[in-house]
């Protein structure tokens, strides 16, 4: 009799633990309707200090949703890493500005994504801020008042 009660108790505790652990890490229902992390074509504005105009180029970037879990119950001293859609493989292309004045190096390089994946943000190579500048934004388009 005690063996059966202990089996039932263990099964109830296991069920309680598994049920609770799934509710600790909740996923928003809308997350499954967002586009996944993938390559997309994007127009990007290139600019170079000393050159008068921006130039638009077509490139591939990583964009989309990565499934991320945020714990409802916060555990002290534990790290929660949010995953972002970022480059897996990339190469750099070179562009030469046609209208730079003499003495200004007209060459600039920009990344072209070859593949993407969900990973922690590497701030050295990616902009993982919540609201960053749009890829086709150009500083030269902002009027300066002196």
Curated annotation (Swiss-Prot):
GO molecular function: hormone activity
Gene Ontology annotations of biological process type: G protein-coupled receptor signaling pathway; ovulation
Pfam families linked: Cys_knot (PF00007)
GO CC annotation terms, alphabetical: cytoplasm; extracellular space
Signal peptide extent: 1-22
Keyword Secreted on entry: yes
CDD domains per the UniProt record, alphabetical: GHB_like (cd00069)
PROSITE patterns from the UniProt entry: GLYCO_HORMONE_BETA_1, GLYCO_HORMONE_BETA_2
InterPro entries in alphabetical order: Cystine-knot_cytokine (IPR029034), Glyco_hormone_CN (IPR006208), Gonadotropin_bsu (IPR001545), Gonadotropin_bsu_CS (IPR018245)
Annotated S-S bridges: 37-85, 51-100, 54-138, 62-116, 66-118, 121-128
Record's subcellular location: Secreted
Glycosylated position list: 41
Keywords: Disulfide bond, Glycoprotein, Hormone, Secreted, Signal
UniProt entry tagged with the keyword Transit peptide: no
Family: Belongs to the glycoprotein hormones subunit beta family.
Subunit comment: Heterodimer of an alpha and a beta chain.
Function, in words: Involved in gametogenesis and steroidogenesis.
Descriptive protein name: Gonadotropin subunit beta-2
Gene from which the chain derives: cgbb
